[in-house]
Swiss-Prot record:
Annotated organism of origin: Schizosaccharomyces pombe (strain 972 / ATCC 24843) (Fission yeast)
Function of the protein: Component the THO subcomplex of the TREX complex, which operates in coupling transcription elongation to mRNA export. The THO complex is recruited to transcribed genes and moves along the gene with the elongating polymerase during transcription. THO is important for stabilizing nascent RNA in the RNA polymerase II elongation complex by preventing formation of DNA:RNA hybrids behind the elongating polymerase.
Residue numbers of Phosphoserine PTMs: 1577
InterPro entries xrefs: PAM2_motif, Tho2, THO_THOC2_C, THO_THOC2_N, THOC2_N
Subcellular location: Nucleus
Pfam families: PAM2 (PF07145), Tho2 (PF11262), Thoc2 (PF11732), THOC2_N (PF16134)
Positions with biased composition (Basic and acidic residues): 1-10, 1360-1399, 1411-1429, 1461-1474, 1494-1526, 1551-1560, 1581-1628
Residue positions, PTM Phosphothreonine: 1406, 1408
GO molecular function: DNA binding; mRNA binding
Keywords, sorted A to Z: Nucleus, Phosphoprotein, Transcription, Transcription regulation
Protein name in UniProt: THO complex subunit 2
Amino acid sequence: MTSLPEKDQQGEVSVSENQKKLSEEWEPYIDKLVASNRTRDERVESIQELFQKCVIEEKLPVDIFFSIFSLAFERLEEKNTLASYVIDTLWLFDTEWIKNFHEGSHDKAEKRLVSIGKGLKEFLPEEWLLSRLDCKFLENINVVPNGDFLNRKIVRTNTSLLYRQKKFNLLREESEGFSHLMINFFDALTCLRNKSLNEDYLIVQVNKSIISTIGAFDLDPNKVLDLILLLFSENLLDSWRFFLSILRNSPWGPNKERKFWNQLPDREKETFLNNLSNANGIFNFDERFTNTKSIMSQVLGHNLQYMYKEDDENLESYFMMVALLIKYNFISIDNIWAHLSPSDEELGKELGKYKDKLDEQTFKAKGNALTMAAPLPDDEIEDGETMDGQKAEAVPEIKKAKPSQKLGLLKSLLSIGDLSSSLLILGRYPFLLRAYPELSNLYHKLLHISISSIYANYSPLKLLPNDVRERLKQPKFIPEDSRLREITLRPPKEKNLVFSLDPFADRFNKTESEVFYYFENYDEDIPILRNLTEFYNIAIPWLRLSGLALCHDPVIVTKLCRIGQKCVDNSSESRTLWLDIIRSLLLPLITLIDVNTGLSYELFELLSKFDSSTRYALYGEWSSTSMKKFPELKLQNSITEKETKGILRRLTKTNVKQFGRLLAKVCHSNPCTVFSIALNQIETYDNLVEVVVDSARFITALDFDALTFIILSSFSNEFKKRLKSDGTSIAHWLQGLASFCGRVFRRYSSLDCTSIVEYVIKQFKVNQMFDLVILKELLSQMTGLQPWTNLSDNQIQGAAGGPVLRQLSLSLIYENPDVVRKSSMRLFNTLQKNGLATQLLVLLSQKYSTCIYDVTDENSHLKLISSLQDECSDVLYLLMEFLNMVCSPKSYYKLIPSFEQLIQDFHIQPQVAFYLSRYKNLDHSLTGSNTEDAMDIDYENTSSPNTASNPVWSIDNSVITELLPKQIWDYFSPNFYLTFWKLSLYDVFVPLERYEFERSRAFDQIRQTDAANTFYSRHRHDRQKIMQLSNSLQNELKEHINSLESVRKVLQGDCVKWFIPNGVFPNGTRLEHARFNCARYLWTLCIAPRLKMSPHDALYCAKFVKLLHSLGTPNFSTMSFLEILFNSQLPSFIFSMTQREADNFGRFLYEVLYDITSWYRDKILYERECLANGALPGFRLYWSDEQNDPDLSAVLPYNKFVLLFSKWHKYLTSYFESCLLSTEYMHIYNSVIILEKILPCFPLIIESGSALKRAAERLKDEEKREDLKVLALGYFAKLSKKQPEWVSFNSFSGTVRPSNSEKLQRPQQLSVAATSAVDSKTASISEEQAKIDKQKVALNPSAPEFVPDSTPSDAVASETDNKNLVENKAVEKRVEARSSANERKQEERRRKTTPEGNRRALRTRTPTNEDIQRSDSKLREDQSRDRTPQSRSFTNENNDNLRSVSRHTRREPQQAQNLNARREHESQKSDRWRQNGNVNRNPRVSNNNSTNVSRERSSEANHRTSNDNKRDEVTEGKDKNKRQDISGESNSRQNNAISRAGRSNGSNRGNDSRDADGRRSTHYASNKRPRSSDSQSPSNLREEDERENSRRRARQDDRRDRDSRQQRDRPRDRTSRSAREEKRRKIQ
């Protein structure tokens, strides 16, 4: 380039002159041109502006224009730059602006431009003007003489340079030269494969031949390179190293050799990893990625573009070659990337296409009503054509999209291990790994190599010895010939390698010898990470780049989980990092991975390093946010929902194993979705609970943990209402979900219920008590216990026994004891480990008193509040029973705070605090047999129950005295208050028959075990366990009896100072109504609070009141207590109770009424138990201030007691009638519950029953509330059934003799126990019996025997009665004629020796140890006699559960007993006919078989001969004296209880008893208080029968005459017998 011409002197003068002409207006433009800080664009813009003002706008004169540029060229040092800008501007104005924008003034502007050019050409180089400006413009400014000639010269020169061929680039132009080149390459490849020549020598010779051939035949080097690359791609598999060496030594070789990772020294590796770690895994792309354009890249790009246009699909080997050239630094990726198709814009659209594809699949995966329904039938015409008769249009064939060359190159780069180049592409298009699984698999293959060193430190193989690991790496030996019997193993043969382009040929090969051609070198350039820092900074970003594509490689996910298990520590950074990995990678990945239980367990091992709240937060994000964020998860979630709903529709109890596995298979990948759907259906359909619980046995630990989270989420859902629409009960969904929760936590030990308990505790703390049902179901299901309301009467009675009987009674007999035991211990360990037991105890105790006040106004329905209180009571009971069952004494004491802490620190009510403290001393409240236990007391050295030897009850008196007002202690002592609350039912009651029943059941199980065909060892083991149980029951019964006697002995001495301990003048002033107030305070402060706690406590209160009376407690008035019980406060008391409390009060009231009714029916019993010749002060009328002296004149006589009892009935009728007629819900509901409980004892009077019946009828007819209406309907039916047993008030009270209309409303019914066969000797008796059976009539409950002090001579019989009596008398005479005295004696002896006789005798007195031993020996004799095959009538079921009870009716196995029963039946038939109108005295009797059997047993001693009567009197006197000697007055309570229990076979519940699950037992009676017609003890029955026999013989003749006279005076009942029977059936 020539420099600018120098200016002459004249020019300088002209310039200076022009400079003077410049004004200040144009001076800034000069500054813009010459300023050094001006950019290129700013200078060009200033030049164009000056040209426009001068040429176009004519605002700048030409001379001033020249002056501006002259000064600019003078001042500017870089004149060439300004000259270049001016020349470009001249070209622009000449070719574009003047011609296109100024057509009107074109000539003027062109002239001005020419003049400017002529003036400026002196400052511009001529060469630049000739090369840039148009030829015509150059001619105009006088640079060239002829512009056309210059233009022709330029054309000729370009033609010569561009179109004259010097080298041959077509095969047809120089075929010989190209053929020679190809032959040289083929010969070299042949030598290389045959290994005939050295490879290095071949490479040198081939390169020489290439150069010589190009020079000799004038070949185009680019064409030669193209041919070499084509040969390279075709011979890639076995000759890639050869071609790379040829190209490396050729002129097209790389400028710089690249060092791979395995070639770097350790120092460079460390530096590289540090730089890579600091850059978070981002490579520092050096010049090899940004090389200038090379010939090789242009040749490759041209070929690739041609192949894309021609749809050449066989490009895999070509892409592999390009990838090798990139890896070995021949070309850079940016040089080749621009030549690949499709464009970057189209490649970026792949993400949108991928998401649209997933959305479409998601839409199709969603099930709807139409797709889930059955297919519809096709509507076709007869000829098979469609309805419209038209053929379906042909679907146009979709043109297959061309394969992406960029994806092919990326796949090849990943295949050969070029990680750095691959990351350059993946960093820009990371979604490619998610959209194309083959790319992600190749990428993960490289990551495996990178983290291999780190994973080796945490692999399970590291735990193995080195020699074992080495043996695992050795190839497995294979058999030489599998057809031979004796197989000889040999090492496998070496494989003949066959190279393939498939990177996974070694994994998915069709033949054993196929391998990837580059398998030896693909890992040579992958950095190997060494420590966790590099893993976090490098590997984790690489894994995040793959993202959800990791689902295609579960192995790398497993490795990641195992590394995390070892690396998660207590540091916050580590935990935060792994939480982010779990949240963003692992949990979403588990949804997309196919069923992989191993991976599920590995992930849960990592999750278990975090607490439950953190895990549940992760599950919540996983199930909600992640499912909506990623389209892959959204699709998988839709598929899971559809599959889950389909499985649940088909899941039943019969196919749980099949469909449960399918449900678990779906659950492994997406447990939150599966369980959410399952729980939603469980909340609606209860029948799914059991089948879903069964199907959960196939799921993993992660699934169980997610299930707990889903349960908690469902419980805590604020949008679900916890009450039904009526607001009176718990919602159905909450009840069903709580039931499922309890069952599933009991069934599976993998589930941890800590979170559920913690949730319930938090709910309690915020006064959300509706979740009590959750804790109730959890405790009930996991412990096998049931609330008091779900227990039968037998279970409640059995709970009063020792630990063994208590556990047998309270446990669910149909539960597997091993399952319950394991689940109980799991629950206890959970509560103890997390300190939740004490929290629950205290919270429940507090909420027991405050839960009714925690409800809101909108939930204040009385029924809801009542049920809430009952639920709290049930849960507290279950928790206490559970802790008492599984805790050791020491741990149990630690769990329960002391009494002082409960009262003072936790502000718990006294009755609840005593309730908790009693459980500390449950087994032995006052006595004990194990002196090592902290609860035991030595009674020989103890005079008071409250002594320091019992640490549990060593409560400071100041604590007790502060519980009640000070004036209360003037009426009873703190010692009594503490004694009452500390004692339990165990201390005052022995469930004798429950012990007998359980031991009898144990012997039945022994017989079943003997009969079962089991192995000897199993049989011996089972028999030993059952015998151990029987012996435990026997020992426990002995201990219980001894404990009862000891307790009574202690209380007998302590009761002296219980009431009015300081006398009636404690402070010098007399106490007003002292004994009445004692009874009142006893009721309000002791009895009333405790009886509401539980059925056990209700029974205890009744027994305790009876105990106070029987002990002759000074200053205690039983009559005053009963007056307070039946006074006007009863309706208010009923209203204030909940439903369960009303049930408990009903039990208490029944026990009290039963005892009072027994005294009412038997004057002798009343005098013995209530008066005791004045020794018992309970019914004293007059009291002395000094001492309670025995004085019969001061006690209540029997006739006045009858009037008092009648008055109480009248009061009760009035109170309950007012409650039934009330509109208050609690009045009605509670009163009906109580009335049903006391129905056997109340009402007994016609007036009372009629009033209550009318009230119940009105209630069932007019009540709109369904629950009350159902209750009233049930009570009305039961009351109607009892109506025939009622008597009039006059008859009941004995004030006025009954009128004719009240006498014998129905004839006497004579029933006979059914038997199967009769002895031949009694055939004639059977014939007479058949005649009498046709005349069966009902009992007459209004007989005069109900009237106290009345005699049978006062009774009046109806006409039908007279007829029956005459027939009965005739039958009696015939029976006496046929039955001899010897037969009766033999029958009596036989009856006494039967087991039933022994049991009946046992019930009539206090059991002793000798009685128990005799009973044991008798049971063993029965057992040994029943072992014969002929006597086995029981099933051969082998029951491993010692506490389970057979659900089938137990049958008597002995044929001898059947014969004895038939003989006894004959004797009883003959005895019954001697009654002649003897009416039962029990108003509770019902016309059923149990009543008849009871009457038969009670009348056996009434109809013997005079000699037999005398013998019976002597025997009875001896037995009576013996009983009095054994028991005495102090044991009268126990005698009465046992005697009443002994008559349970005659109860209105039938001859056989039922245990907790309703199974019958003919051996022993029910432990529930009997409801039989015979309410008296056997001794009293004998005395009464003797009196009746003597009176009957004296009045036998007079009665017949009197009956006949009354029959004539009485109107005849003309109703037919069939009509009367029909009427009787309707009433019943």
